[in-house]
A protein has these predicted regions:
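Structured binding/interaction patches within domain cores
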Residues: 2-189
Length: 189
């Protein structure tokens, strides 16, 4: 049973992805391999809300929106939605946009997602939704039903479904090199 309303967001994300922790050892898809590499390199579950939002913002802005496969397949209205999401993430982190306003935007974008017929557009919109989680929802989700890994790792699956192995590898490279993740690097002895 869902312990809190915010858990439903994570459950929706997980619906479209495999249960990576159970299958990671036996699956050799590029998204699972990338997820395994990420969790072997960083303490993903230690990532805080602010850092996750910065990473999500930078991914949408610098990787997702610059990918050629996006511009060939995604309508301009969704590109604008992604750009708007980037602005809203930063406004929320600087306390200009309230958590309530971010929550309203998340509901609006979920409605767009649910009305889309194209799975390609739905995958793209689902990646955008990752940036529209407010801090209270993030905290509730972690306290009641998920880990940061449960939130972050399905992104690899959505990236893989959207543009294949090439973008999946770019996403991993982006994460491994992101300055925010340095402090979460696992020191292997």
């Amino acid at each position: 049973m869902i312990a809190c309303a915010s858990c439903s967001h994570v459950l929706k994300i997980l619906e479209s992805a495999t249960v990576m922790e159970v299958k990671m050892a036996e699956v050799n898809r590029p998204d699972v391999i990338a997820g395994r590499e990420l969790t072997n390199t960083f303490d993903i579950d230690a990532i805080n809300y602010y850092d996750l939002q910065i990473i999500t913002h930078d991914f949408i802005k610098n990787v997702l929106l610059s990918s050629p496969c996006i511009h060939n397949q995604i309508p301009d209205t969704l590109i604008q939605l992604a750009e708007n999401t980037c602005r809203k993430i930063l406004l929320n982190l600087s306390n200009v946009l309230s958590d309530e306003e971010l929550k309203e935007e998340r509901i609006r974008v979920w409605e767009i997602h649910d009305s889309q017929a194209s799975s390609y557009e739905r995958n793209f919109t689902q990646l955008i939704l990752g940036g529209l989680i407010d801090e209270e929802q993030f905290t509730d989700t972690l306290e009641n039903c998920a880990t940061v890994s449960d939130i972050l790792l399905p992104t690899f699956f959505n990236v893989y479904k959207l543009c294949g192995e090439e973008l999946c590898k770019k996403y991993l490279e982006f994460l491994v090199n992101h300055p925010t993740l340095r402090k979460y690097r696992i020191e292997h002895v």
